[in-house]
């Protein structure tokens, strides 16, 4: 993969200037990556209606080229290929999903997913396209996509490019939902989502973003909500109303349930999507 920015805005450039790590992740670079995946899928049967799905993937980039250059006597970082710096990193992701049948018309779906990426050798920052983010219709539905993290960090500005630096090298997320039939093709769901992303290395531009075990529970965003699904055989039209319970950053309100005001500007998120979140 080759990444190259053709055109940028003033706001975008300003964000990169204020955050060197993000700027490095967006620079023109060659990503010589290979991925290896393992998938286990125990499909539901008449005797065992509970499905279990597990997928783990390992992605590595730049190691073969780096090894060849090392044997050729080229050492250090910032080495180039085709005129551009090449990325070097390892990235591990894993996702486990279980569906437990409760009755003929209802089930409980649970998901746990995690991942970690580490850049080293030729580069010190993961490419932006390989970094983790959280929130949105298929993640923590009570928070908009890329609106939380890393850690307890919160951008000081509310510009249109503020979401750019809300990514991380580590991701933890868990989701649980009770899905049931209402009538005909209409289905309902009650759900709860939790998780966040973090940085491997400490950055002064994103204070509180690094992963720490101490106080980790405070940095886990938590949301709940309910939704409707309309099944038209080939696709499922979904609407989920997410209700935030705990934000991982300082909201100015004391206590664990620290959402100050509930409204569609803060605290409530309506997600419209096609298909199930997992």
Segments and roles (model prediction):
Residues 230-234, 264-278:
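Outer-membrane beta-barrel "beta-signal"
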Residues 1-180, 190-213:
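C-terminal outer-membrane beta-barrel translocator/porin domains of Gram-negative envelope proteins
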Residues 194-210, 234, 241-260, 276-278:
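C-terminal beta-signal and adjacent terminal beta-strands/loops
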Residues 185-193, 273-278:
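Long, low-complexity, intrinsically disordered polar/charged segments
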């Amino acid at each position: 993969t080759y990444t190259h920015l053709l055109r940028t805005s003033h706001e975008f450039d300003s964000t990169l200037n204020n955050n060197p790590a993000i700027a490095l992740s967006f620079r023109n670079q060659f990503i010589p990556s290979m991925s290896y995946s393992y998938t286990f899928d125990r499909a539901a049967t008449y005797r065992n209606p509970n499905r279990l799905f597990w997928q783990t993937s390992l992605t590595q980039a730049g190691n073969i080229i780096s090894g060849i250059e090392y044997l050729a006597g080229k050492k250090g970082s910032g080495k180039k290929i085709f005129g551009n710096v090449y990325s070097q990193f390892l990235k591990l992701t894993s996702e486990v999903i279980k569906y437990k049948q409760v009755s003929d018309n209802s089930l409980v779906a649970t998901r746990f997913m995690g991942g970690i990426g580490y850049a080293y050798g030729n580069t010190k920052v993961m490419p932006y396209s390989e970094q983790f983010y959280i929130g949105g219709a298929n993640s923590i539905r009570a928070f908009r996509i890329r609106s939380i993290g890393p850690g307890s960090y919160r951008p000081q500005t509310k510009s249109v490019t503020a979401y750019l630096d809300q990514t991380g090298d580590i991701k933890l997320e868990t989701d649980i939902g009770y899905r049931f039939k209402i009538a005909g093709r209409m289905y309902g769901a009650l759900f709860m989502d939790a998780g966040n992303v973090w940085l491997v290395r400490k950055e002064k531009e994103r204070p509180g973003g690094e992963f720490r075990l101490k106080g980790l529970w405070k940095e886990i965003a938590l949301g709940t909500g309910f939704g409707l699904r309309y099944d038209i055989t080939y696709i499922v039209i979904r609407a989920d109303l997410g209700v935030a319970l705990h934000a991982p950053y300082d909201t100015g309100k004391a206590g664990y349930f620290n959402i100050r005001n509930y409204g569609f500007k803060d605290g409530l998120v309506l997600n419209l999507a096609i298909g199930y979140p997992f």
